Every structure is written in structure tokens, then in C-alpha cells.
Amino acid sequence: MFNDIPVFDYEDIQLIPNKCIISSRSQADTSVKLGNYTFKLPVIPANMQTIIDEEVAETLACEGYFYIMHRFNEEERKPFIKRMHDKGLIASISVGVKDYEYDFVTSLKEDAPEFITIDIAHGHSNSVIEMIQHIKQELPETFVIAGNVGTPEAVRELENAGADATKVGIGPGKVCITKVKTGFGTGGWQLAALRWCSKAARKPIIADGGIRTHGDIAKSIRFGASMVMIGSLFAGHLESPGKLVEVEGQQFKEYYGSASEYQKGEHKNVEGKKILLPVKGRLEDTLTEMQQDLQSSISYAGGKELDSLRHVDYVIVKNSIWNGDSI
């Protein structure tokens, strides 16, 4: 069965244009609804320590973008929820599945966040299912995102447990080495895995990992994603919390994976690595460029909104999209 699945990734696909029906790309609507909220773009900066902190989260929320705060400053999560609610902003946090997280979730009853993401590397597990059920019992109004997974069976099981959305992607990210360390994952066929999982889904799918260009966002939506989580494209900005490093007169920001020894603080069960990225400028400029490029994608799709991307045809051009050019 598995060997019958078409295997391809982002660089192997080109979308086929339809007749344009808008006079300017600025007429294209890139907004997306998740739960009871509408956001400006279908993108989420990865919930990683070198991508997002409280300041970046607040900026994103103020500007109408979705965000997920990482879970690695555990004692700061509850004050963060209060801070966001005091400012009239949505609170979106991450939790793990260890025993103490159950008490933490229960403690949120008086000030429940709008979104909770259960964030572990291998999300198709009883521990995630039990945490979904616990959150839904304690905080029934909270939107639960669960992951990460890579199969239709996992999507169905997490949805049946009560997840409101599932996050698809096992190790396709730029600083993730799961496929090398374990032999498992969706690295190299993330887009095909997304297509496979979305066919089984009844609720939103969040594509997580493997995004290298803005065009990959449109491709993700074409193959079933409601939103797209992105790491490396959001790393390295002036506002990014990664450490600033100077090498031969050029400034770089650190970017490391959520299962790296740099994040974990120990050399144990490491599935991530650290790299240096040239400082890119302001996050706001990248978000604006993403929106403009996605508006262009919608115009090529022959529509006015994101849904038009779901209906375009495509061709598989194995590894030839760059024609030898680097990106």
C-alpha cells in the first residue's frame, strides 16, 4: 500500500496557471480562518526558541497573524497568557505530554488560552491522545492542535480523540536530522505526505517543515494544508530571539532545532542541529513579501482567495524546478 503512494516534494512540483480574474494582486485575499478567528496569512512561525519569544508573539498577534509560543520556558507560560489577555490579544501556547503538564492544563481553567498545541516529535502516540482528551475535558473551549504526525491513520486517531487540527511533518525541517538519526520521517517527501494525510482529514491540517520558498506555501495549500508552519524563513531576523554572532565581519543569527542539544541542554535523544543564518532584516518585511507572493499565487490560480489554490492542476518535474539555479 505505502509503495503505491506518489512520492514527491516541494521542488518536484509546479502548479499550472488558470486565467486571471483580478486586475491587481492586491485584490487577492490571503486571510484564513482557524477556529473562531481569522488571520492575515496562512503561515505560522515555528514554535522554536530561535524563532519566537514573547515580544515576537505579541507583535504577530497585534498585526493579525497567528502564532504558537514555544514550550521551553515552562514557568513563563501562565504569565504569558495573562499578558496577552490583558492586552486584548489571543493566547496560543504549547505543551508537552509529561505528567506535570496535566496539572498545568488544569490550572488554566480561570484564564484559558484560545489555542494549545501539543508539541512532540512523534505525535501518533497514546500520550498525545490522552493529553488531547485531558485538555478537552478541562478546557473545552480551547482549540487544540496536535502533532507531529505523518500518516492518515495518525490524523484520524488524533482527530477522533478531539484534536481540532493536526500538524503534519516528521523531520523535514532545515535543522531537523530525525531522518538521519532514526531512519524515519517525511523528509524528502513532505508534500506527498501532506497530500496523503489531508485526504483522510476532516479538520484543518497544518503543514510543518520543508518550506524553503514562498511558493511552497501555495503548494502546501494546494495539497491540503489550511496553514503552514515555517522555521528557517522566519529565523535570522533582527527581532528573532536567536543569538547574534559575528563571523568575518558579517552578522548571523543562531537557528537550532527543537530537539537539538542546544535547546535540550543535554546530549541525549538529539534530533536537531544548529546553523548560522545571515541576518535578514525586519520580520515585518518578510511577512509583507510573503503576503504579496501569495497574492500573486492566487492570481495565477485564477481566483480571489486561498481556496482557489486547492483546485489548480500541477505537474511533477523531478528536481528540475531550479534549472540548475541555486536559491
From Swiss-Prot:
SMART domains: IMPDH (SM01240). NADP(+) binds at residues 205-228. NCBIfam families: GMP_reduct_2, PRK05458.1. Transmembrane segments: none annotated. The gene is guaC. Belongs to the IMPDH/GMPR family. GuaC type 2 subfamily. It comes from Streptococcus agalactiae serotype V (strain ATCC BAA-611 / 2603 V/R). Its EC number is 1.7.1.7. Coiled coil: none annotated. One of its GO terms (cellular component) is cytosol. This is GMP reductase.
